[in-house]
Regions:
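NAD(P)+-binding Rossmann beta1-loop-alpha1 motif at the extreme N-terminus of oxidoreductases
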Residues: 1-55, 110
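Internal alpha-helical scaffold of NAD(P)-dependent oxidoreductase catalytic cores
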Residues: 25-27, 135, 156-187, 202-230
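Rossmann-like NAD(P)-binding element
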Residues: 34-37, 41, 52-117, 124
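Rossmann-like dinucleotide-binding cores of NAD(P)H-dependent redox enzymes
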Residues: 34-48, 52-67, 156-166, 192-199
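A short structural micro-motif
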Residues: 73-77, 226-231
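Rossmann-fold dinucleotide-binding core
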Residues: 116-186, 193-196
Length: 246
């Protein structure tokens, strides 16, 4: 399994951290982006960012030797064609359906016939992405949480056509990364799978409380932390998920 090569398409807040996590778990990983600046930023974050190897070494989370080995397994590329030669390709581009559909169309043309195509979408239909390919049995959702280096969350989204082999492979990779994979069904008529549907219901109600003058957003955050032992409140979650908890 660790001889498997994995490609990550998109070097943003999520893509860079996911690539770092996969390389740390022992996989040869290529992080791809059309922007050289995005690739440089991602590499800098992997090396010296808040969740990067330098700080992880300082905190005793990883040895210098293991961090060096992970960096040796991690590469950055502007070539989607090169990245698509991997055994698994995980799409992590911005949450725009038109962009994700285009990426899956391009991956279908570039990837080998046995390559599993996964998406880190927060809620778009995996069936719609699979429809851009000739391999719907090898298309699957793998939704990560921010920051991906830390969070154990792994929402594995399957369609009626996703093969058991693809599901098992992604589950095994997720577990080897220290994640807790939970398989859920694609719901093409709704956005958000499980985690985000429940999350946004909470956010809507929290915003109603503020709009009605019942409490401030700061007080809502603190009450939820105190009552439910959350690390942060709902409004703080929005900011953290957006900026990668930097």
């Amino acid at each position: 399994m660790k001889e498997m090569r994995i490609g990550v398409i998109g070097a943003g807040v999520m893509g860079g951290g996911i690539a770092q996590t996969l390389a740390t778990a022992g996989y040869y990983t290529t992080c791809c982006d059309v922007s050289p600046d995005a690739l440089k930023t991602a590499e800098d974050q992997v090396r010296t960012g808040r969740y990067g190897f330098e700080r992880a070494i300082e905190r005793g989370k990883i040895s210098e030797e293991d961090a060096g080995a992970a960096l040796d397994r991690l590469s950055f590329s502007e070539s989607l064609t090169e990245t698509a030669t991997a055994d698994i390709v995980l799409e992590c581009v911005p949450e725009r359906l038109d962009l994700k559909l285009r990426v899956f169309r391009d991956l279908e043309a570039a990837a080998g016939p046995e390559t599993i195509l996964a998406s880190n979408s927060s809620g778009f239909s995996i069936s719609a992405l699979a429809a851009m390919t000739e391999r719907p049995d090898k298309v699957i959702g793998w939704h990560w949480a921010s920051p991906p280096v830390i969070m154990p969350f792994a929402e594995i989204v399957v369609t009626s056509e996703t093969s058991p082999d693809a599901v098992q492979t992604i589950q095994e990779v997720a577990r080897s990364c220290g994640k807790n994979p939970i398989v859920v069904n694609d719901a093409p008529m709704s956005w958000g799978y499980v985690a985000n549907r429940v999350y946004f219901a909470m956010i809507r109600e929290a915003q109603r409380v503020v709009d009605e003058g019942v409490a401030s957003s700061e007080d809502v955050n603190q009450l939820m932390v105190d009552c439910y032992n959350w690390p942060v409140g709902p409004f703080a979650m929005i900011k953290g998920a957006t900026d990668g908890w930097q």
